[in-house]
Curated annotation (Swiss-Prot):
Places the protein is found: Lipid droplet
Ranges annotated as spanning the membrane: none
GO CC aspect terms: cytoplasm; endoplasmic reticulum; lipid droplet
Pfam hit, one: DUF4484
Lipidation positions, renumbered (S-palmitoyl cysteine): C511, C516
Additional free-text comment from the UniProt record: Present with 2550 molecules/cell in log phase SD medium.
Species: Saccharomyces cerevisiae (strain ATCC 204508 / S288c) (Baker's yeast)
InterPro entries listed in its UniProt record: DUF4484, LCHN/Anr2, Lipid_Metab_Assoc_Protein, Tripartite_DENN
Residues covered by the uDENN domain: 31-185
Name of the featured protein: Uncharacterized protein ANR2
Keyword Nuclease: no
């Protein structure tokens, strides 16, 4: 980890969701606008586009990004994506830059079926209207208030409601060979125009769509204790693929990618200015056409992306873990089916027993929910069984204290969720829950970083080539599971990533006295 002594240019004390939501009024200039279409004979095609003069934006395969496989099962949807800039031969994702894009999709096939009781292919219309933002040249006062990376990853979304309105107007005009409405919108809001007029706030703006961060409570409920191994993987900058199930909204699934990116961020006051290399990269919707781009991401410089193309899972060299979601009907109506997290080798990645305990005793309280019997069973299905050693120690405490005391390692869940009312919308509990959850994970990350840093600094006299040995009981201080091999490996990996130091963890029997 880069730990230069320079003072950070941006120093937010805590995550503030009001600043994030209010920034919706600030819209960066558009570098490119395009219209793609699904043609019954030709497939996905671009039928119109316009870019600012001198913009080196590669629109190759943009028709597949804006019309990903499976989107035809939605009446309308929003698709996030990135457009990589040209890769040099020796360039890696650590230096790769890309532009963020968004497209609004709309089709009429379901209306045709409802009206005619059959599908007339000659009448089917499937369009995606999209914009691309060159975030390298974007300017916003938001950068002064909170992480510019959060702003960049969401920059294109600030146009989603406008694209919805524009595409609807264009379809209603019935002359589908006229693009004047798009031309006018681009001329008023392109990067060159807005650079001269600062950040423009639109008059008579259409109603904003939900901010992607507002889906965090939803995903925390659906993932259950699996939110924790996903958070740990994001801190390690694993390459994470989220598999979009059949019939699911791309907007919903991309919100998970954004939320994973958001909760993984390291506070800038810990790591200084050199932060761009330390975040997992949200690249949103990808397909087989993006394989060369995905191959540029090496282990430890990861991404979080969504895909509806299961064929990508047959290329384990391009990802570390895959999150297999259930379809919306399954999520809502058949909760017995659980989300799965699998490694590239096909092994299931489960939550630790402590993750489960923290989720049920802490996170569910924040979500204002009680664990039902069915939910408890489902949570246990995605959790590792407790070790025999923990079983014996728990039994010892139960017998000798009549259940009055528990072993110290259970007290890790006393790590409280920071509560903070930051905005003028106290009635919107979901927004407040989202903020509290983000701040909880940021605080856990900060504590993990600081505690490991203290241990390493106290061992400075040890040869840097020699591993630093810590007791397994120390993981309790880190709010991790001292019995779990998974958490043992996580501590070793994160210490090596952040501090370039190797750590050994003592065998559990050696620390039994500390635990008892």
């Amino acid at each position: 980890m880069n730990s230069g002594g320079e003072e950070p240019t941006i120093k937010p004390n805590v995550f503030n969701i009001t600043q994030l939501l209010n920034s919706n009024g600030e819209k960066p200039g558009i570098a490119c606008i395009f219209l793609s279409k699904f043609d019954m004979k030709k497939g996905n095609i671009i039928i119109w586009s316009k870019s600012i003069n001198g913009a080196a934006i590669d629109l190759s395969n943009i028709e597949f990004k804006s019309l990903p496989a499976g989107i035809h099962e939605q009446t309308d949807d929003v698709v996030n994506f990135v457009v990589p800039k040209e890769l040099d031969v020796c360039q890696t994702a650590k230096t790769t830059t890309y532009d963020y894009g968004i497209a609004y999709f709309k089709q009429n096939s379901f209306d045709i079926i409802e009206n005619d009781n059959r599908i007339d292919r000659s009448k089917v219309q499937m369009f995606s209207l999209g914009v691309i933002i060159d975030v390298q040249n974007a300017s916003s006062d938001s950068k002064k208030h909170f992480y510019k990376e959060i702003y960049h990853a969401y920059a294109a979304n600030r146009y989603s409601s406008y694209l919805e309105s524009l595409l609807g107007q264009w379809i209603r005009q019935r002359d589908l060979d006229k693009f004047d409405i798009f031309e006018k919108f681009f001329d008023e809001n392109n990067q060159g125009h807005m650079a001269e007029n600062s950040v423009e706030v639109f008059e008579h703006s259409p109603k904003e769509r939900r901010h992607l961060v507002e889906y965090l409570p939803y995903w925390t409920r659906k993932l259950g204790p699996l939110i924790f191994p996903l958070w740990k993987a994001s801190l390690l900058q694993s390459r994470i693929l989220i598999l979009v199930p059949q019939g699911e909204s791309f907007e919903l699934c991309n919100s998970l990618a954004y939320c994973v990116f958001l909760i993984s961020m390291l506070p800038k006051n810990l790591i200084g200015n050199h932060v761009s290399d330390e975040y997992i990269k949200p690249i949103f919707t990808v397909s087989t056409s993006d394989i060369p781009f995905l191959e540029s991401f090496k282990k430890g410089n990861g991404y979080v992306a969504t895909t509806s193309e299961e064929i990508l899972l047959y290329k384990p060299e391009i990802y570390d873990i895959v999150v297999k979601l259930t379809s919306s009907s399954t999520i809502e109506e058949s909760p017995e089916k659980e989300v799965e997290i699998l490694t590239a080798s096909g092994e299931q990645n489960k939550a630790t027993p402590l993750d489960l305990e923290v989720y049920e005793k802490l996170i569910l309280g924040e979500l204002q929910e009680d664990a039902s019997t069915n939910a408890t069973c489902r949570h246990h299905e995605v959790t590792e069984p407790i070790s025999w050693l923990q079983f014996l120690i728990d039994g010892f405490f139960l017998l000798t204290t009549a259940g009055y005391l528990v072993a110290p390692y259970h007290l890790a869940n006393n790590f409280k969720i920071p509560r903070h009312v930051s905005g003028p919308e106290p009635n919107n509990s979901e927004i407040q829950i989202a903020e509290n959850l983000v701040r909880y994970f940021h605080r856990r990350t900060s504590n993990l970083y600081n505690d490991l840093k203290d241990v390493i600094q106290k061992s400075e006299n040890i040869d840097s080539e020699q591993p630093i040995t810590i007791a397994a009981s120390f993981l309790t201080k880190l709010n991790l599971d001292c019995f779990s091999k998974q958490d043992h490996q996580f501590v070793k990996d994160i210490a090596l990533k952040w501090f370039q130091r190797s750590i050994d963890i003592s065998n559990l029997p050696e620390c039994l006295g500390n635990l008892c």
